[in-house]
Amino acid sequence: MSRFDGRPADLISSRRNPLVHQVRALQQPRGRREQGLLLLEGTHLLQECRRLGLPLDRLIATTRWQEQHPTLLGSEPLQPVSPEVLQAMASTDSPDGVISLLPHPAPGLQAPSWPQAKAP
């Protein structure tokens, strides 16, 4: 995670880093409940979060992904990781370079109403 002093976080290159275990736990309902976070994998889901204005807890991304998608970087903490570490965190076979952690909605919150498509 980015440091509070404004300096970027160090690249995580070890699969034994505690963050790897924390993120992998989010693949299970218990981990999501305990940490209060949702795991979103991929650029498309991050784009949707940005489009909807959803607040993110943090981004975890490879250096290459950051270079290719600078406009998707926001004000939330950014944790750079090696491609091997991202692969260890992800549930997909071929992650595209980014994982977003989103605060889990509080119980009882109503989902936003989506516009209904009109029948032809």
Show the residue positions of the predicted features.
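Short, glycine- and charge-enriched coil/turn segments that flank and shape catalytic ligand pockets
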Residues: G53, R64-P77, G108-K118
